[in-house]
Each structure stands twice: as structure tokens, then as C-alpha cells.
């Protein structure tokens, strides 16, 4: 796509719109672009009557800030996406977007070069980046992030009721001083989980104050923990994710605070660290396979029916009870 744009001295966005049959391109220029694309052997896009499995390439875009050393939640999610794509004969192409690319508003290469028919955008990205991708003309689905102002299909885990369920369990175990661990506003997922925490606490007649919320990450999205802002030690910490819960366990152990004897800790996601840690972390299990499956189904639906109504799918999970929570007498 970038080669076509260079030859005709137009933007890749213009080329993408012309090839996708979208508005904003004159008929004369559209014909030139389509003719040159045919001459250069550009692969045609999927149409309503086409068989998707014949030549469907799907891009998966992840922000570099979410990719940690070794395994992470998003790596597991990506593996399941590849599985579900392979089951229908489609190919998944991964692109990790660097912080510099986000800041400079650089369109991902797989979009610039026209290598994909559609994109699964994993996690939170700046609004301007999302708008830029939308203007490229390539259909995409947002996975693990949602905002009503976004006019794209989306698939998210049930962070709100998931955290509500976790805190309800802590309350049933006799806990009242429960601190939420997560930087509210850092991501849509953390914010949803915070609201679920607030609802459970409010229903129990407990007012949530600022000192009951413990931030867990810095501006680079690295997990950083400190108890300095807590006026009174809680009996339980409800963490926004398992990685934070695991690091909190380590943080507490280093300071001689026992889990669950002195304080209880819960996580969210049911990532592998929640099982391997000592003690095992009580958490909310996100149905990663269902999220991957739904995101693929959503995107294929959009490719086959471009004018279909927007869909926002919430995938439920379940509470996973382990050894990091103790009843308060």
C-alpha cells in the first residue's frame, strides 16, 4: 500500500480508502489507485461473497507497554487468537507498537503496507491513535478495552462484576477494611474493576476514601508499590490484576507481613502467577479463550458485513478460591 501511495504521491490513508471503496477519494483518483494496485498484484480485500478462510490475514496490534519479559496476560490472549484464526484458515500477524510510534502517531506497518484484511487492537491506545487507525479504512475490533465514544466493535472481560464478586467474597469472609490496589484511570480495565470494588463496598455500607486506594504503577506502566499513603493497614488488598497481587505478596513478605495470616490478598485474571505463588492467590478467572474467540468472530462479522451494527461483548468469568484469603473473626 505504501508503494502505491509513493508512486501516486498520495497518503497511505487515501490508498486504503480507495481500495476499500470508502468516501473521501475522487472517482478519478480511485480508478488510478485501483488500476495501479491491480498492476502491482495487490491482493483484493474480502467481499461479502468471498470465502474468508481462503486468504484472510488478521493483524494483532499490542502496545509495547503491555508486553513484559516472558509470559504475560496478553501473550496468552494472543496465543488463543492465533489458535482460533488457524481453525478457520486465517493467518495472524503480530505488530508491537513502540511508545515512540504511539507518540509520533505512526500508522502500524501492517496497516501501511496493506498486509492485513482486519485488525484486532489489544489493550488501551491513545484516542488519536485509534482515530488514525479508523481513518486507514481497515476494519478493526478493540479487545480488552472499551469506551462508549469509540465507534468500533469491542470485546472485554467483565471487570466490573468480576471485581464486585471478589470484594463480595472478602466481605463474606468478614473483611471491612479492604484496599483497592490499582492506578485508577491508567487503563479502562483498571477503572472498571475499581467501580466494581466501589459498588460492593457501598452496598456493604462502607465509604471508600482516597487512602483506601493504592496506586500500583508509574507513568511507564511499570508496577511500583508503596504503603506510605495508607493511614490504617487494611485486613485485605483487592488487586486489579494477578501480577500486581503477586508483587504485593513479595512486597509484604519482605516486610515481615504474612499472607493470609496478617492480611489477605486477591488478584484478577487467573494468570499463571496466581497458581504458582505461595500462597496461591484467590482471583477472578477471566475466560481468555472466550475473549479471543469472540474477538475473531466479531472481526470476521465486520469483514463480511461492513455496515452491521456495532457490538460490544462482555465476557464473564468466575471466582477462583485459593489460599491467600483468611476469614476475619
Pin down the residues of each PLM region.
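N-terminal helix-turn-helix DNA-binding module of bacterial transcription factors
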Residues: 1-52
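N-terminal helix-turn-helix/winged-helix DNA-binding helices
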Residues: 37-73
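Hinge/beta->alpha junction and helix N-cap segments in small-molecule ligand-binding domains
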Residues: 63-76, 94-102, 155-165, 181-225, ...
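Short, well-structured alpha-helical segments in soluble
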Residues: 102-116, 220-233
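Flexible loop/hinge segments that line or gate small-molecule binding clefts
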Residues: 122-162, 243, 269-281
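Short acidic capping loops at alpha-helix termini that bridge into adjacent secondary structure
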Residues: 176-177, 208-212, 259-264
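Flexible loop/turn connectors
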Residues: 224-329
Amino acid at each position: 500500500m505504501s508503494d502505491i501511495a509513493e508512486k501516486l504521491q498520495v497518503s497511505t490513508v487515501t490508498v486504503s480508502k480507495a481500495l476499500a471503496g470508502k468516501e473521501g477519494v475522487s472517482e478519478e483518483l480511485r480508478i488510478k489507485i485501483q488500476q495501479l494496485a491491480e498492476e502491482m498484484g495487490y491482493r483484493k480485500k474480502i467481499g461479502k461473497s468471498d470465502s474468508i478462510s481462503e486468504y484472510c490475514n488478521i493483524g494483532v496490534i499490542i502496545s509495547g507497554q503491555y508486553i513484559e519479559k516472558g509470559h504475560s496476560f496478553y501473550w496468552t490472549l494472543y496465543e488463543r487468537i492465533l489458535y482460533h484464526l488457524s481453525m478457520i484458515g486465517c493467518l495472524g500477524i503480530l505488530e508491537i507498537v513502540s511508545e515512540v510510534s504511539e507518540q509520533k502517531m505512526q500508522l502500524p506497518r501492517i496497516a501501511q503496507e496493506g498486509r492485513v484484511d482486519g485488525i484486532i487492537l489489544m489493550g488501551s491506545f491513545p484516542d488519536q491513535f485509534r482515530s488514525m487507525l479508523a481513518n486507514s479504512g481497515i476494519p478493526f475490533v478493540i479487545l480488552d478495552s472499551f469506551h462508549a465514544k469509540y465507534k468500533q466493535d469491542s470485546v472485554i472481560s467483565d471487570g466490573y462484576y468480576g471485581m464486585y464478586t471478589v470484594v463480595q467474597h472478602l466481605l463474606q469472609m468478614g473483611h471491612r477494611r479492604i484496599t483497592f490496589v490499582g492506578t485508577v484511570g491508567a487503563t479502562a480495565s483498571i477503572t472498571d474493576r475499581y467501580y466494581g470494588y466501589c459498588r460492593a463496598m457501598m452496598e456493604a455500607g462502607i465509604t471508600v476514601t482516597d487512602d483506601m486506594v493504592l496506586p500500583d504503577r508509574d507513568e511507564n506502566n511499570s508496577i511500583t508499590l508503596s504503603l506510605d499513603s495508607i493511614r490504617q493497614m487494611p485486613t485485605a488488598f483487592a488487586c486489579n490484576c494477578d501480577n500486581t497481587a503477586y508483587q504485593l505478596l513479595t512486597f509484604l513478605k519482605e516486610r515481615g507481613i504474612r499472607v493470609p495470616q496478617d492480611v489477605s490478598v486477591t488478584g484478577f485474571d487467573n494468570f499463571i502467577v496466581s497458581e504458582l505463588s505461595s500462597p496461591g492467590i484467590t482471583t477472578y478467572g477471566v475466560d481468555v479463550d472466550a475473549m479471543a474467540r469472540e474477538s475473531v468472530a466479531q472481526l470476521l462479522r465486520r469483514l463480511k458485513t461492513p455496515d452491521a451494527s456495532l457490538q460490544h461483548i462482555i465476557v464473564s468469568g468466575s471466582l477462583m478460591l485459593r489460599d491467600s484469603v483468611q476469614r476475619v473473626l
